[in-house]
Every structure is written in structure tokens, then in C-alpha cells.
Curated annotation (Swiss-Prot):
Polar residues bias spans: 95-111, 565-576, 701-719, 779-807
Main location, first listed in the record: nucleus
Domain SET residues, every copy: 210-337
Chain positions found as Phosphoserine: S496, S533, S575, S714, S716
Function recorded in the entry: Transcriptional regulator that acts via the formation of large multiprotein complexes that modify and/or remodel the chromatin. Required for both gene activation and repression. Part of the Set3C complex, which is required to repress early/middle sporulation genes during meiosis. Required for the transcriptional activation of genes with high activity.
Entry protein name: SET domain-containing protein 3
The entry's keywords: Activator, Chromatin regulator, Meiosis, Metal-binding, Nucleus, Phosphoprotein, Repressor, Transcription, Transcription regulation, Zinc, Zinc-finger
PANTHER family, sorted: UPSET, ISOFORM A
UniProt record similarity statement: Belongs to the class V-like SAM-binding methyltransferase superfamily. Histone-lysine methyltransferase family. SET3 subfamily.
Any one annotated GO CC term: heterochromatin
Source taxon at top rank: Eukaryota
Gene3D superfamilies hit by this protein: SET domain (2.170.270.10), Zinc/RING finger domain, C3HC4 (zinc finger) (3.30.40.10)
SUPFAM superfamilies, per the entry: FYVE/PHD zinc finger, SET domain
Length: 859
């Protein structure tokens, strides 16, 4: 886009500007001392070619020009207000800057042959307008020269006529919309096609060259063409009006070109004409003749036909013929030439009303919108206009569709509750309790939750008095019915399948211990709090019956002496995955416990609930005396507690296996809690194994021997004891191992900087199973007797290897197994110190070989 940058420094166009060859900016020729009669071939501005320029003089010249133009504008405004007639007012020097020519208009040759731009006047006689000034709007189809660089406005020319009120809408001439052609231009396919045409001959003198003129068209809306072709005389039918010129191609070429959008419009674009005698197309959008301004409409009065002119059969020529009688000053209108399958043809006058579905209606609306963006019907009869009929049809169809939807919606709303039976909501259909209480909730979800809680409270009143803090202790005990518990039929108001149980008033205020809390072997709170598994369903014996109270002599105590269950329940809970339960099938082999036994667990449920259903997660068991494959889908029994002898610093206690309990002499002893359960209460420990790729039937272990003389260690592989295996296949229980256990050093050897320092973060950790406790017992009992290592009651003499015979090695990077061994030794050392601090006297004790930490077993 051109830009004026002058030394004056005004940026408006005075009608005579010149362009710099280097930076392509425009400057006022008067400001740079250039005369209209002496225009240079090449011009460079003061910045590209520095030279002295009088900027003050240039500023005064342009300022005087602007003052003259303002005076002229005031004179014109006074003349228009005093007289509405069209008058001509001439200025002294040039035209108004508003309507002055742009730098891209008109080409003339100066005195020295230089190309320059000059403002031109263009007028057209007729009844539509009086005078029109030179065009000021650029047009893509206007011819222009690539070498145009300078513009000039001759000062001696008469001033331009101003725009009058009658013609102020049309600011440029129709000549700027096209390039006049002397003859048609044919494409290769059109030229080949035209050789085989059989057309009539026409004499050139028969054509009415001056029968029409181009006039501006006043349109109510914007359209692509602002001009039309109007007859100046009476034209009879079948009369050649004028020749149509342009670029000639075939219809196949035109339709296949995507820019023509024929697949959407279904008709030629404006200034494009289809020949009625052949398959040729005349494209006059860029170049052509005055006939290109013939608009199209539904009531056409002309058609384009191809003929041979003056007996020449070389190439055809295209003539605009009149089809009807055309009166003077009547617009020449051509045919739309719609496609044969165009849907607009169904809306022509005399055709029956078409029917379209909603999808076709939307497509029709899109075609109409696109078509009207390029075209405008030139017919004055809008009632018979195809586009008006299509527009009305689309609007009526949409209104009918909207009215149909509204009527359907009204029909749905008209269905009142009185005419339609009301469907109660799920919450309303639920039976309410006979005695309304505060537990009845408003919402459906809260109602069922409160009903669920109420049924639990009525079935198991002892839940009210249980502790509320989390407990991680599993206590195994045999069921014992309370004498004060009576059965009651299910409550009909709540429609609960669970039996409601009331507590006797005599024992309601009595403080019961959890160790004395017994329940029926078939019904417990765990049945209510946990889902029923298939195994539990198979074990049920049908409806509940009144249980008989067993005699106290028949109940075998499972709680070790001096064990306070209530105190244990108040301690910190442990993860339920660290202590898997034992399958009842294992217990049935060696224990008289029946399947009626329940396990009091409070890990995920309320405290004191009797759970008949074990966790379904599968875990491998490490057994001392049993190699069978456990059944984890059945009930299991497990117990863990922490004796007071093993209190550690901080709030994180270590778990102690239930087989370690105190005798009457306050000494810890490793033995089953009862002789009758010695086979079932085996040492069942499990570590959380991250790597589950352990091979079955593979026995791996290593003995770690420590020398108390210098604290060095030797890691020698050895065969693991027979009773300690990862095998899951059922194997008969072998006798206890008799191989000597590894020697564990005393506290003095642990302190001699042979192991990592006692980091509280390492020592204050949570023991995962009974191996740590067994090693703790072994270490604590070897404090007073460091040379005695007890394995199954037999004393093993320490090695006589001297300190000099033992190999010494430089510090090296520890492996994962070595690091775990050292960390566990530090833990055991800290536990021994804690036991001594509490005044516990350790004594030799028999430790199974399976309790020795296996470095290959991953925590």
C-alpha cells in the first residue's frame, strides 16, 4: 500500500506526488522542487539521496493549499444549503483532497517519457446521473503498469466537477471493473471443441452496438455488481444486442475448477455466461465488453448464443440476443442457467410444492445463503422470484418444526399428577419405624445407613461399650455365650434379616472384659460388618437356634497368664497384612478347635467384632513345623501381643509372637500357650515380600558367624534347616533340626565399630514379624552368657578360632543382604539395652533355628 512521507510534513495527497525508487515512499512534487513539465526518470528521496531541502517552504506551500481547499468546502456547503438544484462550483486550484486521485490510477506519458499518474475525469451521459469524478477506489481488475512511479496533476487543467447529491452513491466508473478486450481468448480444450460446431452466420452490421448503456444500479443491499445494462431504445425479440467477450472455456473446465464453487452454487457466477448453443462458457469477470454488466434474474429477457461472424468459421463469437420485447430504459436480464438437478428448479412458478426433510432443509438453506452472497436477482417481480420462494419455504418449515416441538412440550406439561398415577419415590415407599426416632434420616442414603446402624446396635449391644481407638491386636479365643444374651426375632419395622439381641438389665451396667466376651459360633458382628463370602455361606447351618452355654471346664483358655487383653487393645494397631491368619485345615490336624471359632479383629472394623471371614489376600506362610499348603479362604486364627518386658523407646512398639509369654516367675518362655494347641500354635511369620519370584522347593539360607574377639564376620552358605522352608507343597512335618545355630556375638562385639552406628531412625522402626523378636530374645539371653548359643535346648560350644586366624578385610560397600543383617543386629542390640534398662534378667533359652534371620528373605 502506498504511503506519503514528505518534508512538509503533511500526509494528504495534493494530486501531484512522486515515488522514490529505493524506499518506495511518495512525496509531494512541489515540496521537493519538481515541476510537472520536468519529471525525472528516476527519483530518490532526501533520505536515500541526501541533499538540501527547504522544509519551511514546503510547509508553507502545503498549508496554503489546505486553506484554499477549506474555503472551497465552505462555499460548496453554502451553495447546497441555499439551493437544492445541481450546481457546479469550480475551485481555483485542483479538486478536493477527499476525491483526489490515488497514486495507482491512470497512466500517461510525461514530456520526457517518464511514467506518471494523473487524475482523470470520467462522466457518462444518461438519466441516472449528471457527473462522476475520477475513481478513488482501487480495483483488482483495473489495468496498471509495473513501472508507474510518479503522478502528476496538470495545474492548467480545469477543476474537476464535484459530486452532486444525485450521484454521491457512485464514486467510480464502470470502466474500472474490467479490461476491455478486442477479441476472445480461448483455452486449448475450448478451441478444439469449437472446431466441430455447426453455427449460423451473422453479419456484424446486424448487431446493435449502441442499443444499451451501462448505468449504476441502486441496490438495497450490498452485491457484487453495482452496475447494470439498460436499453436505450426499443428492442424487438431475437435481436442481437451486443457481443459478449471474455475468456472462453468448456463447461467441464469451469465446473471442475474449485474456485468457481459450482458444486455448491449449481450455477455460474456473476459475469459468467453459459452458451445456449454449445458447451462453451464465456468468463468476463476480469476482461470483456460492456455486455458483462448484464445481470441475471428469474424473469430473463436475453440469452447468450454462439454464432459465426461475417462468414468466418474459424472461431465462434458470442452474441447477446433478446428473447422478448424490450422497452427503452429497461434492464437487460440474463438467465440463471441453473443445473438440471438444482433444487431451486422445483420452486419455479407452476411447479408443485416440494417436500424436504429437516436435513435436506438445512442443506437447502446453506445453498441459498451461499448463492445470495454472490448474486442478486435483477427481476422486479419478487413474488415469482425463485429465491424469495425458497426463503419463504425455509422460514415456514422452520416455524412449523418449532411449533411442533412446542406442541409436544405442551402435551407433556399438560399431563398433571391427577391424570397420571404418581409414582412414589424410593424413600417414600420405604417403611418407617413404628416408633419414630432421631436416627430416621431424610434422604434415602442416610435412611439406609441409619437403619443399618440401628440393626447392628439391636443385634449386638456390647458394641456400645467397646473402645473407640484403633487396635491392631488379634486375640484368639474360643466362643463362649454370655448368660445374659437372649435371642430375639428380627424387627419387622426395619425389615432386617439380622436378629435383634437385647442385653439383660442385670448385666447391662456390668463392665465386661473383651477376654470374657463370647458370642455364638455362627453369628457375630463380623457377619454384619463384612460381606458374606461363599465359604461362610457354606458353613452356615440355616436359621439361628438357641445356643447352649458350655460349661466353664470345657473351655480351654487361650490367653496366656498375666496377659491383659484390654491393655493390649489400647496400643497402636499393626498392619493386617503383616500377620496372616492360619487356615483351619491346619488346626484341625493337631488342635481340637472347630470351625465355630472366631477371631476378634479390629483392624478394619469396630473393636471387639468377631470375624468369621478371613482376609482373602493370599500370603505365603513360613512355618516351623508345618509344610502344608494353607487354605486362605477359610477361617483362620492368629494372635499377637506385646509383653511388657519388651518396651522400646518412643511410641512405636515391637510386636511379640503369642508363643512368648510369662510364667509365674516373670520369666519369658518359648512354648505354646496350651499343650492341646502345641501343634496348631506354631511359629507363623510372614514378611511383606516385594519380589514374589521366590522359587518353590528351594531352600536357601546362610549362617552368619561372628567372632567376639575382634568382631569380624564370615558369611558362609549353609543348608537351611528342614523345618524352615518356602515350599508350599504338602510335606509331612520332619523332626526338629539339630544342626548348630549360628553364633551371635555379645553386646561388646556389637559396639566395637564393626556395624553401623545406632541411628534412632533405624532403631525406631516397626518389626514386621516374629523373626526380629526371636533374634531379640536370643541376643538378650546371651548378654550374661556370651559363649552359650542355645539351639533346641542344646549348648553349642563357640569356635576356638583365634583372632589372628580370622581374615580381616578393608571396609567395602555393603550389599543389600549385608546391610539388612547389620541393621537387624543394631536393632537387637538396642532391644537388649532396653531390656536391661527395665531390669529384666535374661537367661539361656532355646531358640529354633528357623528364627535366625535369613538374609535371602526380603523384607
Amino acid at each position: 500500500m502506498w504511503k506519503i512521507r514528505c518534508v512538509c510534513p503533511f500526509e494528504d495527497d495534493d494530486g501531484f506526488t512522486i515515488q522514490c525508487e529505493s524506499c518506495e515512499v511518495w512525496q509531494h512534487a512541489v515540496c521537493v522542487n519538481i515541476d510537472a513539465n520536468n519529471v525525472p526518470e528516476k527519483y530518490f528521496c532526501e533520505q536515500c539521496q541526501p541533499r538540501p531541502i527547504d522544509a519551511d517552504k514546503a510547509h508553507k506551500i502545503q498549508l496554503a493549499r489546505l486553506q484554499r481547499e477549506e474555503e472551497q468546502s465552505r462555499i460548496l456547503s453554502r451553495s447546497r444549503s441555499s439551493n437544492n438544484k445541481r450546481r457546479t462550483s469550480f475551485g481555483k486550484n485542483g479538486a478536493s483532497p477527499t476525491h483526489s486521485a490515488s497514486p495507482r490510477q491512470g497512466n500517461n506519458t510525461g514530456a520526457n517519457g517518464a511514467l506518471f499518474s494523473q487524475s482523470t475525469n470520467s462522466s457518462n451521459s444518461g438519466s441516472y446521473r449528471n457527473s462522476v469524478t475520477g475513481a478513488t477506489l482501487p480495483n483488482a481488475h483495473a489495468p496498471h503498469s509495473q513501472n508507474r512511479r510518479r503522478r502528476s496533476n496538470h495545474l492548467n487543467n480545469p477543476p474537476e466537477a464535484p459530486i452532486t447529491e444525485a450521484s454521491n452513491e457512485y464514486v467510480y466508473s464502470f470502466h474500472l471493473e474490467y479490461v476491455p478486450l478486442e477479441s476472445n481468448t480461448f483455452s486449448a480444450s475450448a478451441l478444439e471443441y469449437s472446431k466441430n460446431l455447426d453455427l449460423k452466420n451473422l453479419d456484424e452490421s446486424e448487431v446493435l452496438m449502441d442499443g444499451c448503456q451501462v448505468v449504476p444500479i441502486s441496490s438495497s443491499k450490498f452485491c457484487c455488481s453495482r452496475f447494470g445494462l439498460v436499453s436505450t431504445c426499443e428492442i424487438p425479440p431475437n435481436t442481437p444486442i451486443m457481443e459478449v467477450k471474455g475468456r472462453v472455456c468448456t463447461q467441464n473446465e469451469y465446473k471442475s475448477d474449485p474456485k468457481n464453487q459450482y458444486n455448491i452454487l449449481g450455477a455460474p457466477k456473476p459475469h459468467v455466461f453459459f452458451d445456449s448453443n454449445s458447451q462453451l462458457v464465456v468468463d468476463s469477470r476480469v476482461a470483456g465488453s460492456k455486455a458483462r454488466f448484464a445481470r441475471k434474474g428469474c424473469q430473463s429477457n436475453s440469452v447468450v448464443s454462439s454464432v459465426y461472424m461475417n462468414g468466418s468459421n474459424s472461431v465462434p463469437r458470442f452474441i447477446l440476443y433478446s428473447t422478448t420485447h424490450i422497452a427503452p430504459e429497461t434492464e437487460i436480464i440474463g438467465d440463471w442457467t441453473l443445473d438440471i438437478s438444482h433444487p431451486f428448479r422445483q420452486f419455479a412458478p407452476g411447479m408443485s410444492r416440494p417436500s424436504f426433510n429437516m436435513e435436506e432443509l438445512e442443506l437447502l438453506s446453506e445453498v441459498l445463503s451461499t448463492f445470495l452472497s454472490f448474486n442478486e436477482c435483477a427481476s422486479q417481480d419478487k413474488k415469482n422470484c425463485v429465491f424469495s420462494r425458497v426463503t419463504k419455504y425455509i422460514k415456514a418449515a422452520r416455524r412449523a418444526s418449532t411449533a411442533n416441538r412446542v406442541s409436544v412440550a405442551k402435551d407433556r406439561l399438560s399431563l398433571t399428577p391427577s391424570s397420571t398415577p404418581s409414582t412414589p419415590s424410593p424413600a417414600e415407599s420405604l417403611p418407617q419405624p413404628s416408633n419414630p426416632t432421631s436416627v430416621y434420616a431424610k434422604s434415602l442414603k442416610e435412611f439406609w445407613l441409619d437403619k443399618y446402624r440401628l440393626s447392628i446396635l439391636q443385634k449386638w449391644p456390647a458394641v456400645k461399650s467397646l473402645p473407640t481407638e484403633s487396635v491392631g491386636i488379634d486375640v484368639v479365643m474360643e466362643p463362649k455365650l454370655q448368660p445374659s444374651v437372649k435371642e430375639k426375632k428380627p424387627t419387622k419395622d426395619l425389615q432386617s434379616p439380622l436378629p435383634s439381641v437385647e442385653e439383660d438389665s442385670s448385666n447391662r451396667d456390668k463392665k465386661t472384659d473383651i477376654a470374657d466376651l463370647h458370642t455364638d459360633s455362627k453369628v457375630g458382628i463380623a457377619d454384619v460388618l463384612s460381606p458374606i463370602s461363599p465359604d461362610a455361606a457354606l458353613q452356615s447351618d440355616g436359621p439361628l437356634k438357641k445356643a447352649k452355654e458350655p460349661e466353664e471346664s470345657s473351655i480351654t483358655p487361650t490367653t496366656p497368664p498375666s496377659f491383659n487383653v484390654g491393655e493390649s487393645l489400647s496400643r497402636r494397631s499393626a498392619s493386617p497384612l503383616q500377620h496372616p491368619r492360619t487356615s483351619p485345615d491346619m488346626l484341625d490336624k493337631t488342635s481340637p478347635c472347630k470351625r465355630g471359632l472366631g477371631t476378634i479383629t479390629t483392624v478394619h472394623k469396630k473393636h471387639g467384632s468377631v470375624d468369621h471371614l478371613p482376609s482373602v489376600k493370599r500370603r505365603r506362610s513360613i512355618a516351623n513345623d508345618f509344610h502344608g499348603k494353607p487354605d486362605y479362604n477359610k477361617r483362620s486364627l492368629s494372635i499377637e501381643r506385646k509383653p511388657e518386658a519388651f518396651k522400646t523407646k518412643g511410641d512405636r512398639p515391637h510386636k511379640v509372637h503369642p508363643s512368648f509369654h510369662r510364667n509365674s516367675d516373670s520369666k519369658l518362655k518359648l512354648e505354646p500357650s496350651s499343650k492341646e494347641k502345641s501343634g496348631s500354635m506354631f511359629f507363623n511369620t510372614l514378611r511383606t515380600v516385594k519380589d514374589k519370584s521366590h522359587v518353590h522347593d528351594t531352600q536357601r539360607s546362610s549362617d552368619v558367624n561372628f567372632s567376639r574377639q575382634n568382631g569380624t564376620r564370615s558369611h558362609s552358605p549353609s543348608v537351611s534347616p528342614v523345618g524352615f522352608s518356602f515350599d508350599k507343597s504338602p510335606v509331612t512335618t520332619p523332626p526338629l533340626p539339630t544342626a548348630p545355630a549360628p553364633v551371635i556375638t555379645s553386646r561388646h562385639a556389637l559396639v566395637n565399630n564393626q556395624f553401623p552406628t545406632n541411628n534412632p531412625n533405624i532403631l525406631d522402626h516397626k518389626a514386621n514379624n516374629g523373626d526380629d523378636i526371636s533374634n531379640a530374645l536370643n541376643t538378650s539371653r546371651s548378654e550374661n552368657k556370651p559363649n552359650s548359643n542355645l539351639v533346641q535346648g542344646s549348648v553349642v560350644k563357640p569356635s576356638n578360632t583365634s583372632a589372628s586366624a580370622l581374615p580381616t578385610s578393608a571396609p567395602k560397600k555393603l550389599s543389600l543382604s549385608e546391610y539388612r543383617q547389620r541393621r537387624q543386629q543394631n536393632i537387637l542390640h538396642q532391644q537388649s539395652k532396653d531390656n536391661q534398662a527395665h531390669g529384666d534378667t535374661a537367661r539361656p533359652h532355646t531358640v529354633p533355628a528357623a528364627t535366625v534371620s535369613n538374609p535371602s528373605f526380603t523384607r
